[in-house]
């Protein structure tokens, strides 16, 4: 009973600290007068460092050292937040961002392996696992900016210090909780009789739609990454406060998380055009609100939620499509990580900063992303119609 609570707490917390830091750093750079590429590049730098270090960690990762690596990542997180508090100079922000990327990789890469060592062979259904995985990390990413938005509303420019103090304090229980979870799991395994595994969901006879999961991910996650990186740069220029900008980012991930939770009891919609088409239309509508409604804060709040719904539907499909055919799951999951990582790395710079720099129009990235989502959505719809006819 306590193990799922502990692991859920760990999942939410490490995404909370990432989410808050990735909104605080660009906002502080904007306040210091940094250029658009320096601001939008924060997410790209973090993603690149995280991806490279995750690959390196994968070379030494085993079930035996997974817990120690998770604790090492926690210690690196603590050092990062301590550094952001004690050496907070603007020129040091990218250095601490590099350390955050390393800490994220050292923590997250072994985390799933560590959870597997606690399960003792128990498995959730594919649909449930896909939905809950997508919901848990996005909820943590939502809570981080949300807490910072609340702190920003009540403090005079020092909310970032309070946020980093909270992040550092969270690392203390997080460091020891994996040991507690491991001991509880060992005790449970000794005293309980293993239950026969529940029948697994079998979708292996369904069409292989992994390619469409990756294409949709490019559209949806590019929308999230670009919007998230541009808001700290464009929001203050439009007169929005740190509180409002942070809340917009938070609403994207809340939309993603609650959409994922709504999909826990999914049956067959993943193989029908209507679900993804509806999600894509939400994304297009949300992006267009950023194009034509940037002067109205409520339009941006609504647009953020709609973009979150789009990424929630696609995030579920990404995980589900890659695991629906077990014989290909290993390769597909690896491609998932490459797709998400490269999208998070390239889109803020190329679509975000790049298109604004080339055109001089702040709305151009959102318009381009809405066109990309429409094209991929139409191609997906065409493919699903072909499958239905065959």
Regions flagged by a language model, labelled:
Residues 68-83, 274-289:
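Structural signature of the two symmetry-related core transmembrane helices
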Residues 41-59, 250-262:
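Central cavity-lining transmembrane alpha-helices of secondary-active solute carriers
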Residues 168-191, 377-384:
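C-terminal membrane-cytosol helix-exit motif in multi-pass small-molecule transporters
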Residues 1-47, 210-216, 221-238, 245-246, ...:
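Helix-loop boundary and gating motifs at the non-cytosolic
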Residues 98-136:
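Cytoplasmic helix-loop-helix junction between adjacent transmembrane helices
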Residues 53-66, 152, 259-272, 355-356:
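Helix-to-loop junctions at the C-terminal end of transmembrane segments
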Residues 106-120, 312-327:
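Intracellular juxtamembrane helix-capping segments at the cytosolic ends
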Residues 328-358:
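A late C-terminal transmembrane helix in Major Facilitator Superfamily
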């Amino acid at each position: 009973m306590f193990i799922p609570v502990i692991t859920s707490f760990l999942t939410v917390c490490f995404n909370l600290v990432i989410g808050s830091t990735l909104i605080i750093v660009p906002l502080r750079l904007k306040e210091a007068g940094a250029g658009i590429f320096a601001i939008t590049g924060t997410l790209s730098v973090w993603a690149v460092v995280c991806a490279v270090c995750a690959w390196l960690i994968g070379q030494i990762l085993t079930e035996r050292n997974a817990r120690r690596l998770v604790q090492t990542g926690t210690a690196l997180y603590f050092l990062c937040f301590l550094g952001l508090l004690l050496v907070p100079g603007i020129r040091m922000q990218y250095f601490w961002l590099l350390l955050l990327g390393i800490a994220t990789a050292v923590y997250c890469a072994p985390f799933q392996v560590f959870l597997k060592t606690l399960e003792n062979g128990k498995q959730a259904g594919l649909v449930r696992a896909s939905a809950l995985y997508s919901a848990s990390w996005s909820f943590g990413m939502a809570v981080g900016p949300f807490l910072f938005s609340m702190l920003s509303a009540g403090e005079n420019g020092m909310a970032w210090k309070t946020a980093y103090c909270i992040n550092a304090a969270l690392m203390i229980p997080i460091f020891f909780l994996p040991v507690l979870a491991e001991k509880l799991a060992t005790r449970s395994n000794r005293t309980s009789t293993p239950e026969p595994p529940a029948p697994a969901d079998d979708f292996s006879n369904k069409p292989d739609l992994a390619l469409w999961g990756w294409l949709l991910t490019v559209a949806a996650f590019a929308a999230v990454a670009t919007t998230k990186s541009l808001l700290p740069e464009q929001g203050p220029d439009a007169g929005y406060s740190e509180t409002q900008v942070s809340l917009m980012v938070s609403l994207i991930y809340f939309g993603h998380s609650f959409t994922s939770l709504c999909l826990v009891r999914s049956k067959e919609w993943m193989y029908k055009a209507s679900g993804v088409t509806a999600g894509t239309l939400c994304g297009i509508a949300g992006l267009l609100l950023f194009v034509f409604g940037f002067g109205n804060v409520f339009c941006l709040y609504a647009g953020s939620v709609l973009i979150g719904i789009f990424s929630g539907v696609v995030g579920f499909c990404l995980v589900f499509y890659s695991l629906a055919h077990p014989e290909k799951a290993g390769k597909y999951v690896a491609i998932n990580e490459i797709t998400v990582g490269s999208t998070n790395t390239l889109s803020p710079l190329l679509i975000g900063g790049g298109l604004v720099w080339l055109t001089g129009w702040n709305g151009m990235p959102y318009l381009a992303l809405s066109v990309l989502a429409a094209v991929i959505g139409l191609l997906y719809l065409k493919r699903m119609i072909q499958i239905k006819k065959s």
